[in-house]
Amino acid sequence: MPWSVIFHEDFDAEFQALDEPLQDELLAHAKLLQFYGPDLGRPTVDTLKGSKHANMKELRFSWQRQVWRMAFAFDPKRSAVLLVGGDKGGVDQKRFYKRLIATADRRFDEHIASLKPLAKKR
């Protein structure tokens, strides 16, 4: 069964600003996530420690000597929500992950909150 992979609306705008070859690379990894879902593990996916969401993960890949990390989490509807990403190469690791996780947590909270009105309508 294929899994749904969606972009948080803020990440979608950031994705559109990326170079097209980098977009293609990210989409190729998103397809792996779509196929394997939560069973996709290292080295492609790893848990993000320090997030307030126990299911917060990072999609990991290299592109043109850059080390990319994309934070995502599975929501209650079983969709992988891509939240934020960036090149962690050449920057302080603690600072990179602190910013990545803070943004991912905030965006995932927003996403979960947006699902609640839908649940009330049922």
Model-derived features: positions:
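Basic, Lys/Arg-enriched alpha-helical interface segments
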Residues: 1-67, 76-80, 87-122
